[in-house]
A protein has these predicted regions:
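Conserved inter-motif catalytic segment of the P-loop NTP-binding fold
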Residues: 2-90
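Phosphate-binding/switch region of NTP-binding enzymes
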Residues: 20, 76, 94-176
């Protein structure tokens, strides 16, 4: 069972993306009913905040996520995007380590895997661990990290894929 906690995409966009992901397998969302729980963007929010004293604190949204995990007991939780789920300084290694520590404790408590979706910096290079935006401790704390980049014109040409079709392909590189 998978729970997605998505603060960027509305329900229609999430539905479209799930349908698109299933299409190559000849499957439909109804085929996995009850196995994918989609949350957001309404009713979700910032999980971890930095208070006026600079301390990292857990929010009401954190408790809401815990309630969802208690109710659904997912095997995998996808948090998308990480930057929208906390107010810690993105380039502060110490603050990000605390954010990750809370998320790790949550995963351990509920015995689930966490997938944190995070943006790359502008001008990022495919397959480069340093392309991941913000503090290096984010990648350091990860068990595995991947970059996802659109197919380049050069790659499409080499594979004889038309420009129109190119947008349907991405490159996934393991960077850790």
């Amino acid at each position: 069972k998978v729970l997605t906690y998505n603060v960027e995409d509305d329900a229609d966009e999430q539905r479209r993306r799930l349908s698109a992901a299933l299409r190559p397998f000849g499957r439909f969302p109804r085929d996995i009913a009850g196995k994918v729980i989609r949350c957001g963007p309404s009713g979700v929010g910032t999980l971890i905040e930095r208070d006026a004293m600079g301390q990292i604190t857990l929010t009401a949204a954190w408790e809401g996520l815990r309630a969802l995990l208690t109710q659904h007991r997912p095997d995998i939780v996808i948090l998308d995007p990480l930057v929208e789920l906390h107010t810690a300084e993105e380039n502060d290694n110490t603050a990000l380590r605390l954010v990750i520590a809370h998320l790790r404790e949550l995963a351990q408590e509920f015995r689930c895997a966490l997938i944190l979706v995070h943006h790359t910096r502008k001008g990022a290079t495919a397959g480069d661990m340093d392309s991941i935006r913000g503090a290096g401790s984010l990648v350091g704390a990860a068990r595995a990290a991947f970059t996802v980049t659109p197919m380049s014109e050069e790659e499409a040409e080499a594979l004889a894929i038309s420009g129109v079709q190119r947008r349907h392909f991405v490159r996934v590189d393991s960077v850790k």
